[in-house]
Structures are given as structure tokens and as C-alpha cells.
Amino acid sequence: TDLRGLDRNTDTVVWLGHSTYFVQLGGRRLLIDPVFSTYASPVFFANRAFEGTNLYTAEDMPDIDYLLISHDHWDHLDYATATALRSKVGQVVCPLGVGAHFEAWGYGKETVFEGDWYSVLEGKGGFAIHILPARHFSGRSLTRNKTLWAGFALVTPEHRIFFSGDSGYGKHFAEIGARFGGFDLAMLDCGQYDENWRYVHMMPEDTAQAAEDLRARALLPGHVGKFAIAY
């Protein structure tokens, strides 16, 4: 699909692999957790993308109104991708502490909206991006939990979309579902088949329950299909 050729007034969601999503909603174009590199780690030989899964590059993206980053792990925040997108991004939306990466990588401070859980970035016509709780952790290289992790709700008068980011199952899903009155679509963490990780990622049965808790009309599982992260 030629993403640049899509009518921006047509609401759509395109999963680009792993946790990367291209979203058009309410006349806005959003890109969530883009990783277009062939690896998701500090070194090129680790956590390599499966062959044939890098179908898009930063050059294939249209201008992006909002770049959403859920947390600063390598498979969600990629330096090469972020810098390649810089000239196309209107505003970055991220949880607390993550904005420092973008400022260090040449983004203007005025282009970064950084918020705590339950912060809201409001636009015209009833459009809003809500930064919401997740059960996870953060860190790059030797740092750990110096920045926040989050999910997002994308809201217009016509539609509500939820993105979990990385998250284990928890009561926050039911609380979010009640707060927003349900969602048209939930894009949820799924498929890291390691019981030792179940408090920071969801097994498939957890994902299904989270979708019910969120009162989602449709479920799009993610965090699969590109990297072998769990063993």
C-alpha cells in the first residue's frame, strides 16, 4: 500500500509489523512506535528482524502529524528511524522522560509533548490523544526505569482506538474501558510466549481478556511477526 497516496480524511489503521502502526483518524496521520531498522538492539547482530518483514522505510511515510512512542525500549524507539523521520513529524507524543531522546536527536523541544499517565493532548474538532497506564518497564543500555511507559487512546467524536504499548495484563484495562465507554479497536500486546514475562507482556489469553475488559469491538494483536524477543 502506498501510504502517501491515502486520502487523509479516510480513517484507517495499517499494521506495519511488531508494534508499528500507521493510523489515519479524524484527518490526522499518526505513526506509532516505528522501527524500520533491521534490528532492535544496541548492536546490529542481535534481535534481527525476520527476513521479508521490513516492507516500509521512513522514506515511504507521508508527513506525520503525531509520532507516538510508548516507551524507550529498542524495539519501540529506534534512533535511525526517529532521525530519518524528523523532517516529516509535526509533533512527538510520549510518556515522561522519553522526550529527552528526541531532543538529543535533533528534534525541537517545542515539538515534543511529554506527559504522565492520564495526560491529554487535545486538538481541534474533538480530536484527542490520551496517555494511559501500562504494566511494563523501560530503559536503554545500562539505564532502567528512568523514563515512563504508557499506552494511548486516540479519540474523535466518531471513533475511539486504544493502543496498549507493551503491557502485562492488569486491572488498568477494565478501568480504561470504563473511563472511555469502550473502543472501536484495541491494538494490544500479544505473543511473547514466555511465562517469566507475563507480568510485563501478555500471553494470548491475557490479550483476549484485556480486549473484553476494554469493551473493544475489534482486536488487532501486535508485538509479533518481526523479532524473536521471547525464548
Language-model segment annotations:
Residues 1-10, 16, 20-72, 79-84, ...:
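Pre-active-site segment of Zn-dependent metallo-hydrolases
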Residues 2-9, 94-159:
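Metallo-beta-lactamase
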Residues 12-15, 30-33, 128-134, 160-166:
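Active-site-proximal beta-strand elements of phosphoester/diester hydrolases
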Residues 32-33, 92-93, 109-117, 184-189:
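Short hydrophobic/aromatic-enriched beta-strand-loop microsegments
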Residues 34-36, 72, 134-135, 165-167, ...:
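Active-site metal-binding loops of divalent metal-dependent hydrolases
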Residues 78-88, 229-231:
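Metal-dependent catalytic neighborhoods of phosphoester/phosphodiester hydrolases
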Residues 132, 155, 159-162, 167-170, ...:
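C-terminal structured domain segments across diverse proteins
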